[in-house]
Amino acid sequence: MVKSKKKTITIVIVAIVIMIAIYFLINVFQPPSLDNPESIAWDGTGSRFLISNTGNGKILYTTDFNQYEVLINEGLSSPRGIKFRTDTLYVADNTVIQIIDVKEAKIVESIPIPGSKMLNDIECDKEGLLYCTDTGANKLFIVNPHTKEINSFISPLMTKPNGIVFDGPRRQMFIVCFKPASPILAFNIDTKTFSIFKETLYDNLDGIAIDDLGRIYYSSWGEKCIFMIPQEQNRTIIWQKDLKAPADIYYHLPTNEILVPLFEDNEIKRFKAD
């Protein structure tokens, strides 16, 4: 009886050790993969794409979207929007903007954002100021990464702000919101005022991008597609459809492509902007 109990205990211990070993092998040696990809940025210095993964808190990089490597493995909570500028990656991470030195592959500074709840997308202007939407707090934050000056802006026009992109020629930010029938908002960076650029009938807008011809693209979870506004800005067309949970889209000038992270399918689609 005693021998039987010892044998059973031994078997259980061996089984536990084997399970731990299998778990370790899977998690350590399994190639990195997308986990709720949210945003994409281009690292011009390293000639690679950077991708934020909200699911596991990692920043991955790739050159071809077939194989991925880890840039940042720890220190982030829920990285969403990312913006690359002069060897630095700015990350909207819940209530903090994380600053990453991409050459050293490490977080070098964190800027807590008072009054924030869910920082989402992030953009910068030509002067290097950061503009960060907060979907939870219904705010737009403007952050000077050098002086650490932070200002917040609200508007009755803006509910659950999500994607943001800089319209340089007109010195304004376009913002879309994760709500029913979200308009495209314009935020004038000189006067600090909001206005409606274009009304839409579409729900839960996530990302917005502008190509080199001035065409505007935005993604909708509700309609599961990417819409495009042509240069004339006189209509809106369905540009790509059957896309589940299209997140923060990105225009890549060197290849003239719109890159679309599919948040729930853990995939990135590439479409020529022809």
What is each model feature region?
Residues 1-16:
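N-terminal Sec-pathway targeting helices
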Residues 25-32, 66-73, 106-112, 148-155, ...:
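A short beta-strand motif characteristic of beta-propeller blades
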Residues 32-46, 74-94, 114-130, 156-181, ...:
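Beta-rich, blade/repeat-based domains predominating
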Residues 51-69:
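Beta-propeller domains
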Residues 56-57, 95-96, 137-138, 180-182, ...:
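Short coil/turn segments within WD40 beta-propeller repeats
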Residues 60, 98-99, 141, 183-185, ...:
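WD40 beta-propeller blade core
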Residues 62-67, 101-106, 144-148, 188-192, ...:
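Short loop/turn segments that connect beta-strands within beta-propeller blades
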Residues 96-145:
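Hydrophobic alpha-helical segments and helix pairs
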